[in-house]
Amino acid sequence: MSVPTITYENFEGDPFIDSISTDDATKGAYEILEWAYRTYGDSIVYSCSFGAESMVLIDLIYQIKPDAQIVFLDTDLHFQETYDLIDRVKEHFPKLRIEMKKPDLTLEEQADKYNPALWKNNPNQCCYIRKIKPLEEVLGGAVAWVSGLRRDQSPTRANTNFINKDERFKSVKVCPLIYWTEDEVWDYIKKHDLPYNALHDQHYPSIGCIPCTAPVFDSEDSRAGRWSNFDKTECGLHVADKP
């Protein structure tokens, strides 16, 4: 299927959602990524959390573009297990270009300017400073970006398409794994012997910053452990999208 270059400005909907075959082993993910990197080249960025879905995407992307650019939003509040995983990924996929993108403010500067525990008193502001604003800077020179969202992760992600108009970042967001289940993600990881975050084996299905991540027990919502004391399940990177 020949699809013209899709930009934020000319976006008219996802051309793949009703036409691409999801019967292959990757449920359309490989074909979507092939199209994305062929279309956008170095103008597409993968914003990677290094969660379970990330490992699947990294493996697929590496087959298509081994020197792809991957950006990790390093808030300075991540678990040591996450940093350990990044080191293992660098060894496993040596050609990847991994950028550790930090916020403008250090934790000390943020504490002096706002609050010593801003994530507790105003988590939305903390997420903006340490995640959203840094990604805005990264995507300033990118036409599109890749995300590992799955439809079954949470109600806020249930309507995600392969190709999305991203109102938050005025960009195109490519989500190849929308039809994957959690079991399929883990089957792929185990089948291909991919590295993954050790915290996943300790009841952490979704892993973010230390203060805002808790283990999950007996819950169908994989994001139940994120901001568990607040009416909040998203950091803000994905909430402004319009399919």
Swiss-Prot record:
A single GO cellular-component term on record: cytoplasm
Cofactor(s) in the UniProt record: [4Fe-4S] cluster
EC number annotated for this UniProt entry: 1.8.4.10
Pfam families found in the cross-reference section: PAPS_reduct
Catalytic activity: [thioredoxin]-disulfide + sulfite + AMP + 2 H(+) = adenosine 5'-phosphosulfate + [thioredoxin]-dithiol
GO biological process entries: cysteine biosynthetic process; hydrogen sulfide biosynthetic process; sulfate assimilation, phosphoadenylyl sulfate reduction by phosphoadenylyl-sulfate reductase (thioredoxin)
Location within or outside the cell: Cytoplasm
Cofactor note text: Binds 1 [4Fe-4S] cluster per subunit.
Pathway the protein contributes to: Sulfur metabolism; hydrogen sulfide biosynthesis; sulfite from sulfate
HAMAP family: CysH
UniProt protein name: Adenosine 5'-phosphosulfate reductase
Organism for this UniProt entry: Staphylococcus haemolyticus (strain JCSC1435)
Lineage: Bacteria, Bacillati, Bacillota, Bacilli, Bacillales
